[in-house]
Every structure is written in structure tokens, then in C-alpha cells.
Design a protein with these regions (language model features):
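Catalytic alpha-helical scaffold of carbohydrate-active enzymes acting on polysaccharides/glycoconjugates
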Residues: 1-117, 122-162, 181-199, 207-271
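Positively charged, amphipathic and often flexible ligand-engagement surfaces
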Residues: 163-177
Length: 271
């Protein structure tokens, strides 16, 4: 069985303390993961602090270069993740284009290359996002929840930028149910991850996540002889398979809101 871990970096604390702890953890267990990075104002910054460059994640660019040197994969997250989380689902094309352009240009200025992938904050999407991802020539995107790689269709927009969905319930959702104690969350996640899926299981965490919980998951997966893959490796394998088009819908995530989700396959519409 295969497992993929991705990390989304959206806060100043995540870009500093959180990343340092996770990088040390992944190094100790010799695991390569995919980091999706925002370069705009941190979600943990208040309104006035968001206006100053020191509270933008770009101010901590050195740690992002350390990620690359450690052999991990880098992908892009929205520039203003707070705005994206609250507005993207109902935004028009112009708003989405402005947000996309700002994220893209910030990425190009820092890394001198185009991003290879993108992940949407809180699984909030709209049709225009899929259009811009295809236009940018991304190798893949990971914006939604789901079960298998697919080409997204939303309203009148069809994209051939493959989606690699997150398959395991986000920790924010599990916590919102109030059904699990923090000390047993890893047991629930591990049980869920036992289901065999075409491209394996994909777990996304925040850079602020408790490293003790992350280590418990790694130890349990290692103990069950899991193979750890990065998202680019999953995308490469998916490219050799028959990828279908699926509609993208919405699913209510307990008290954690609504998340974009892989829905029905489009009849007889494959790559």
C-alpha cells in the first residue's frame, strides 16, 4: 500500500517553528513529502499585521529553500489564504485571476521558475481556478477531497490538469465532530487509511500540526510496510493509467464547513 503526505504552509508560525519540526521529523524517518507554500500574509496575522511585509510568509523564504535542499517537493498555495478560504468558492473570474496572478508572480520572483503544482486553501475552489491551472501548465493540482486521480469538470469548465485529491479526512474535520479524543485521532486515521485506493492514500496536514501526532502516523504506517510516495510520483504513475473526468461538487464536513469533492464520473469521457 502507498501513502503520500502533503503539508500546506499558510501561517507565519507554520513557516518558522512548524516547518523546522516537520523537516526534522521527515528527515529522521527518511520520508519525502510535498509542501504547498503560500507567500502572502499569514492566516495567523491580524488585520493590521497583515499589511506589513514581515508578516508575509515571503519574509521567511530561507526556510523554503531548505525544503528544496532536503529533497522535498514544492508546490504553490494561494497568496492570501484567508481571503481564499472565505471568498474563493463564490468568486468570479476576475477576482480569481487577480489572486492567481499574485501567487504566480510571487512564486516566480522567489524561485525563478513556474510552480509545478497547486493546492487550494481549505479545499475551496471555483471553475476559474481549474482553468488557470491548466493555462499555467501545472503538472498536477491537489485542490479537493476524493478517492482517485481525475480531470476536473465544474460548471462549463473542463481541465486537463490532473487532480490528485486528498483521500483522508482532514484533522480539522475529525476534531470538529467532537467524537474523538486528541489522544486517539491517530487510531481513527490509521483505520481509515487501511482502505485500498487506486493511487494510495493521501494525507494533508498543516505546517502547524502537532508533530507528535504526525510521528505516530508515520510509525504506524512504517510498521505496516507502507511505501511513501511524493505527489509528483503519484502524478507520474497516474499519467500511465486511464484518467477519467469527474465533476467537482461540494460536501459538508461536519462543523468544519463545505469542501470541494470529487463527484460523479462523466460518462465515457476519458483522457
Amino acid at each position: 500500500m502507498r501513502t503520500t503526505i502533503s503539508v500546506i504552509v499558510e501561517t507565519v508560525s507554520g513557516a518558522t517553528t512548524g516547518l523546522e519540526r516537520l523537516l526534522a521529523l521527515f528527515s529522521a524517518y527518511e520520508i519525502s513529502v510535498t509542501f504547498f507554500i503560500s507567500l502572502g500574509p499569514g492566516r495567523d496575522s491580524g488585520f493590521f499585521r497583515r499589511l506589513t511585509a514581515s508578516n508575509h510568509l515571503l519574509a521567511h523564504a530561507d526556510i523554503f529553500r531548505v525544503i528544496e535542499k532536503a529533497g522535498h517537493d514544492l508546490g504553490m498555495a494561494p497568496w492570501d489564504t484567508s481571503a481564499w478560504a472565505s471568498m474563493a468558492a463564490h468568486a468570479d473570474r476576475e477576482w480569481t485571476r487577480t489572486q492567481w496572478k499574485r501567487a504566480l508572480e510571487s512564486w516566480q520572483d522567489l524561485f525563478n521558475v513556474n510552480p509545478a503544482s497547486h493546492a487550494a486553501t481549505d479545499f475551496q475552489v471555483n471553475p476559474w481556478l481549474f482553468e488557470f491551472e491548466q493555462q499555467a501548465g501545472l503538472a498536477f493540482a491537489s485542490d479537493v477531497l476524493g478517492k482517485s486521480p481525475f480531470f476536473p469538470v465544474m460548471q462549463s469548465i473542463e481541465s486537463h490538469c490532473v487532480q490528485l485529491p486528498v483521500t483522508l479526512a482532514p484533522l480539522s474535520v475529525l476534531r470538529a465532530t467532537n467524537k474523538f479524543q486528541e489522544s486517539t485521532l491517530h487510531e481513527e486515521l490509521f483505520a481509515s487509511s487501511q482502505k485500498i485506493l487506486p493511487a494510495g492514500q493521501h494525507w494533508r496536514i498543516s505546517a502547524d500540526e502537532n508533530p507528535v501526532l504526525v510521528e505516530k502516523m508515520i510509525v504506524m504506517w512504517k510498521g505496516s510496510s507502507r511505501e511513501f510516495l511524493t505527489l509528483p510520483a503519484v502524478a507520474e504513475a497516474a499519467a500511465e493509467s486511464d484518467i477519467r473526468q469527474h465533476k467537482v461538487g461540494w460536501d459538508q464536513q461536519e462543523d468544519a464547513g463545505w469542501a470541494a469533492t470529487q463527484s460523479l464520473a462523466c460518462a465515457d469521457r476519458r483522457r
